[in-house]
Amino acid sequence: MAAKDVKFSRDARERMLRGVNILADAVKVTLGPKGRNVVIDKSFGAPRITKDGVTVAKEIELEDKFENMGAQMVREVASKTNDIAGDGTTTATVLAQSIVQEGHKAVAAGMNPMDLKRGIDLAVADVVATLIKNAKKIKTSEEVAQVGTIAGNGDSSVGSMIAEAMQKVGNEGVITVEEAKTAETELEVVEGMQFDRGYLSPYFVTNADKMVADLEDAYILLHEKKLSNLQAMLPILEAVVQTSKPLVIISEDVEGEALATLVVNKLRGGLKIAAVKAPGFGDRRKAMLEDIAILTGGQVISEDLGIKLENVGLNMLGRAKKVSISKENTTIVDGAGKKAEIQGRVAQIKQQIEETTSDYDKEKLQERLAKLAGGVAVIRVGGATEVEVKEKKDRVDDALNATRAAVEEGIVPGGGVALLRASLSINAVGANSDQTAGISIVRRALQAPARQIAANAGAEASIVAGKILENKGATYGYNAQTGEYGDMIAMGIVDPVKVVRTALQDAASVAGLLVTAEAMIAEAPKKESAGGGMPGGMPGGGMGGMGGF
């Protein structure tokens, strides 16, 4: 086991505080509409330029082990806030730095660290309750756009694009952000259910120009296993032919004789048909087939359920207004499923999302939910260079997460005003003077984000904070973009309450632990062994004996 280096009390806390300050000072320059960018060196490729707090925090690794511990704890604040709320990482870092600094002073003055932490926790719980009580629910698309604009660093095109996407796919719909191949940023919406499987044979194509198979008012046969023998399918194929409606077969695979016969029938014009593979694998495939069945009002033909293919009737097939199949994707628009059943399935998937602990499973369930509930919107972020595209994509991601959070829990005045106001209304009472000091630490920390936003905009932080607090209006604040004071909500400067709340809770949680640390242990640096030269005392001569080649 390697030797360890141990630091105690004041020495430990001071080193840790240095680490906290280095990381927080690098992150906090990005806060607010006039926050600056940070350039991050990459071992390969061009440097990355970003204004995203968590991206900056994740890049910082310090040489001194003890300073690094402090920095990593604050990095954890930013990451945790990002995971839960998706935005507010810089605010969380600024709050954590302030709590650690004030806490360090209090401990140095002889106060009890555990009581300070209890006081911090009391104050935070009080502030969170105040924030939730004062939150305003989002009702209009304009309000969604405002949240997106603020989180997107004042870029109104980002805000309006996210608002449009949410309007089209609903609040439950999936909105993904991708890098575009062009300079333009555009929004593409796929309505209905789309999955990433295309036609099994190009002979199924109905539109040769676009190479897609469009089938209107189609029947949909959902089969769990492979189809290789056509004999079992004949009864249902004959029934579909008589209705003169098209048929889409979705199964694990269609191969051999079955596929050849379907293609021949399609080419002869007797049967409008297309076959695609079922999406997903294993249990997820079963679940997705079940989703399609509920969406289209059909039934999955599965031997587990005792249903044989030869016994299938038209009433077991799904229906859809339109099925569009390209080489890579299949889209089912306007399925004939019952509303109540679809809503029941949506509720079931939501329940699974809450219960699962795996991020991967959560993401896949979220995709399934979106396909059932609304649709999928893709925002393709463009720019002149790769560096610009990456920087803009960071902002669009933040804006998207912020708008989702705003729709979920509502909004409060932005620009750090909600926290600044909350500092005046903390009613928590400490059991002793040290706990009261902990409450005061939070009261001071709550002013830090508003002060930092003002400082980044070139204003005098103390004057701005004082002027906001002089005015009794709950939504009165400072617009750092224009340098004016006024009603923040009327000016469209709003923050999602979930983001503000999460930032404060995560910052206080980690900062409270840092304040209570009394000893720190790190691996001792390895001493360089003395003596140079070549290993094993090999003589430094040449390889003369190897001549003659």
Curated annotation (Swiss-Prot):
Enzyme class at the top of the EC tree: isomerase
One BP term from GO:
protein refolding
The residues listed in the UniProt record as binding ATP, with positions renumbered to this chain, are T30, L31, G32, P33, K51, D87, G88, T89, T90, T91, G415, D495
- Compartments (UniProt record): Cytoplasm
Q: Which reactions fall under this protein's catalytic activity?
A: ATP + H2O + a folded polypeptide = ADP + phosphate + an unfolded polypeptide
Write out the entry's keywords from A to Z. Answer: ATP-binding, Chaperone, Cytoplasm, Isomerase, Nucleotide-binding, Plasmid
Care to name a GO molecular-function term for this sequence? Answer: ATP binding
Q: What is its EC number?
A: 5.6.1.7
User: One GO CC term of this entry?
Assistant: cytoplasm
- What function does the entry list? Together with its co-chaperonin GroES, plays an essential role in assisting protein folding. The GroEL-GroES system forms a nano-cage that allows encapsulation of the non-native substrate proteins and provides a physical environment optimized to promote and accelerate protein folding.
* Subunit structure comment from the entry: Forms a cylinder of 14 subunits composed of two heptameric rings stacked back-to-back. Interacts with the co-chaperonin GroES.
Stated family = Belongs to the chaperonin (HSP60) family.
Provide the protein name: Chaperonin GroEL 5
The organism that produces this protein has a lineage beginning with: Bacteria, Pseudomonadati, Pseudomonadota, Alphaproteobacteria, Hyphomicrobiales
Q: Which gene encodes it?
A: groEL5
